[in-house]
Amino acid sequence: MTENHYLLLTPGPLTTTKTVKEVMLYDWCTWDVEYNMMVQKVRAKLVSLATKEEEKYTTVLMQGSGTFSVEAVIGSVIPKNGKLLVCTNGAYGKRIVQMAEMLHIDVVVSQTEEWEPTNIVEVEKILQQDKEITHIAVVHCETTTGIINPIVDVCKLGKQYGKVTLVDAMSSFGGIEIDIAELQIDFLISSANKCIQGVPGFGFVIAQRDELLKCKGQARSLSLDLYDQWETMENQNGKWRFTSPTHVVHAFYQALLELEKEGGVRARYNRYYNNQKLLVNRMGEIGFKPLVNEKYQSPIITSFIYPEGNFEFQQLYNELKRYGFVIYPGKISKVDTFRIGNIGDVHEEDINRLVDSIAKGVVIG
């Protein structure tokens, strides 16, 4: 077991560095000028990670989990007479549908199997047939399985039909290179505790300025009013409307500096990619097969199908935890799977130690 207590092989919360943890040992004031300046630096750094055309975009930080930020977008961006098309092939796409329904937003769904990417042909057919659709939403990396969805094609199609594009990049932003201006993404949502390698406590929305300005007065919630949150941060030098997670913001700023030190998003992607390939190859040697086809597989998290025989996931989980690892159960309904993530402060030697623990018969006799 490491000094981190457990190595989290999960898609977030994840294993953070010692230095990210250490900055949370101090207390901070939400009204402090230096703290607000840090918030502004965080906002600017996120835009620069997202696109070269920085002047067209802005960042809104939102308290809570990433789901809070997704709901802030759904509830603030779509007008009362709007209609949302959601591309879904997993739990997080379904969650967007549920949000829309609870907010009384007209919604239509393009659904594929959980191990298949979004069907572009079906999406275009829906857009051709339903002229009332105003917005289209897609999850980039659906961590239900680890599949990557074709956001380039979805957003291109959305703009071809004049729609506002919403991308849930919760588990991909900072770990997979994305230029939101090139992809014509209007609103991208992610979270502090994913590929940037911070800790849970806030999410963020990188928004196309002109589209964000249209959201004034549209929010269906006070605390999740995306426009009002942005206007306060923008006009009051990084101030949050309500109490902000000061420790989490400091940890996130440190994580951003460490991302830069590592070599940026491309370098981090390469580490994640190599982790994932090593994981699949080593697990294959001991009889575990991945659920998702290699060409659709993300470098973020991998779903493995239960092997034949007397396999007990809970035994696997408990034994691995004894040896200092935490993994994820499966989240799909039609196939028995479990999931192993390889993002966070995770390296080749960690993947090898994990698989060695399994291969030695610790878990599987």
Swiss-Prot record:
The modification N6-(pyridoxal phosphate)lysine is found at residue 194. GO terms for molecular function: 2-aminoethylphosphonate-pyruvate transaminase activity. Keywords: Aminotransferase, Pyridoxal phosphate, Pyruvate, Transferase. SUPFAM superfamilies: PLP-dependent transferases (SSF53383). The keyword Nucleotide-binding does not apply. InterPro entries: Aminotrans_V_dom (IPR000192), NH2EtPonate_pyrv_transaminase (IPR012703), PyrdxlP-dep_Trfase (IPR015424), PyrdxlP-dep_Trfase_major (IPR015421), PyrdxlP-dep_Trfase_small (IPR015422), SP_NH2Trfase/AEP_transaminase (IPR024169). Gene3D superfamilies: Aspartate Aminotransferase, domain 1 (3.90.1150.10), Type I PLP-dependent aspartate aminotransferase-like (Major domain) (3.40.640.10). Its cofactor is pyridoxal 5'-phosphate. Its EC number is 2.6.1.37. It is an enzyme of class 2 (transferase). It catalyses: (2-aminoethyl)phosphonate + pyruvate = phosphonoacetaldehyde + L-alanine. GO terms for biological process: organic phosphonate catabolic process. It comes from the Bacteria. Belongs to the class-V pyridoxal-phosphate-dependent aminotransferase family. PhnW subfamily. Involved in phosphonate degradation. Homodimer. This is 2-aminoethylphosphonate--pyruvate transaminase. It comes from Bacillus cereus (strain 03BB102). The lineage of its organism: Bacteria, Bacillati, Bacillota, Bacilli, Bacillales. The gene is phnW.
